[in-house]
Amino acid sequence: MGKGSIAVVGGGLAGLMATLKIVEAGLSVDLFSLVPFKRSHSACAQGGINAALNTKGEGDSIDEHFDDTIYGGDFLANQPQVRAMCEAAPKIVNMFDRMGVMFNRTPEGLLDLRRFGGTQKRRTAFAGATTGQQLLYALDEQVRALEVEGKVRTYVGWEFVSTIIHNGVCCGITAQDLSSMEIRAFPADAVVIATGGCGAVFGKSTNSTINTGYAAARCYQQGALYANGEFIQIHPTAIPGFDKNRLMSESARGEGGRVWTYKDGKPWYFLEEKYPAYGNLVPRDIATREIFDVCVNQHLGINGQNVVYLDVSHIPAPVLNAKLEGILDIYQKFVGDDPRKVPMRVAPSVHYSMGGLWVGLDQQTNIPGLFAAGECDYTQHGANRLGANSLLSAVFAGMTAGPNAAAYAKGLPEDQNIPKSVYEAATAKDESDYRSILKLDGAENAYRLHQKMGELMTKNVTVVRNNADLAETLVKLEEIDERLSRIGVQDKATWSNANVPFIRQLYGMVDLAMVITKGALERNESRGSHFKPEFPDRNDEEWLKTTIARYDTASHSPVLSYEKVDTSLIAPRKRDYTKAH
């Protein structure tokens, strides 16, 4: 059985944190990443990390952080996991402080905090507007030190292909070197999947283009359960782009930025007018729906487009440069305007997946030996994630998955031995599948099919959903799934071939699109990011439950069931952000 090591797939915050904890527990790690760790999507998180540090003397507490998170997620998150995360948050921020992360500080030397959406307290520690990058770089340095000591073996530029499952237990992975195209089996006592979100399912999103969701999709295809797939966060303020959308952080509003458009020839600050208690810092699902209403229903978007203004030009330039320089420079680079002088034009965009692989309290999936951590799991955010809880949940999930994966590995029978033939068979199968894709010579273009799927999902399965469109989307996704077999591969090279991995990823993206769409179709209520005008209210009696998708190998379709939500710590109540809660 393995080598007394664990395979970690993903080099972002969750994967690196899990790696550190596994090595702390005395085991070695094989660490896989598509890109150099510092280029993982965690680097794109801008605004900060939440923790009830109370350095502002506002009386903030872990209890309030916990309540805000559960309330913001519309009570769909299992509460013990969220409570544990909020309790760990101050320790996590202090850990990064000791690692040398250059958090902004007050004149007194305390950690500075800013407000984020869905809160009444300043709770978000930040390093300018590049917080994710700074946290990622700190963990990268720690892992590099362990690599030098021989405790971590890194495989950068390798893509996860499949889990290896023997007698119902995960005992390793196969992965492909994207330069040589070699496929190898890697025995492991346990596997941690930490590969982020699935924004590419929607075509353009704020996610990095590597965020296809393939690893989670492949685990789902191999029997892992996928939970709450229908809950996709649409960020209210992104920079529209031809190639992809780019995030304009909530921190811009946290530092005093205002969202507005023209109405009757005058600036209209519609969020401040409708939600006086929270103003521009209402939760993201609410801000997005208000912007959608203003642009699509009231036709009040700027210059007739589906964009509004996000204005920070009234804030003194020295303050902007000290706290928001990173994101303002991004806007100036890609748009050409200086946001210090003119309002920014922003629009909602697919941003984050609250759903993901089903895991228990120990971050283990329903397949023994297979763990998941970070955005690719479903545990912390319910129906809507609060801003600045993403960095926290990624680190916390890695911090939980790592020790539990190590404990699982140590608990395996000493005489357990997986035959070499199991790994040889897994390698042979994935090699055969790779060769089969390489030989495809049909008339369909994989990139066109991906574009069609993305446009379909963005149109029908984002801000506003209705059952007729969702049913039609499912039919069209099934048509796309059928067309996959008729793809033609233009690049037949047997080295550095980007076409074949993309087609493999596309198979997974179509399956995840079906999970998301079917979950949305079946859930006849409105909750968090899931909004159906046909069913405008939250329905706890029928729908206070987690959606569980199981893959049907014959039809390639999800089979849905439901699981009770643990609401043992806070009784559900109606969300209302027109007043402080």
Features from the language model and the residues they span:
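Glycine- and aromatic-enriched mobile tails/lids
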Residues: 1-5, 21, 25, 36-38, ...
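Core beta-strand elements of the Rossmann-like FAD/NAD(P) dinucleotide-binding domain
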Residues: 2-4, 181-190, 366
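N-terminal Rossmann-like FAD-binding beta1-loop-alpha1 element of flavoenzymes
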Residues: 5-31
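Conserved N-terminal glycine-rich FAD pyrophosphate-binding loop of Rossmann-like flavoproteins
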Residues: 35-68, 247
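Short beta-strand to alpha-helix junction loop
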Residues: 77-87, 125-140, 155, 205-213, ...
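Conserved redox-cofactor binding core of oxidoreductases
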Residues: 92, 97-182, 187, 194, ...
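Glycine-rich loop(s) and the adjacent beta-strand/alpha-helix scaffold that form part
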Residues: 190-245, 302, 387-404
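An anion/pyrophosphate-binding glycine-rich loop and adjacent beta-alpha core
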Residues: 218, 224-337, 404-411
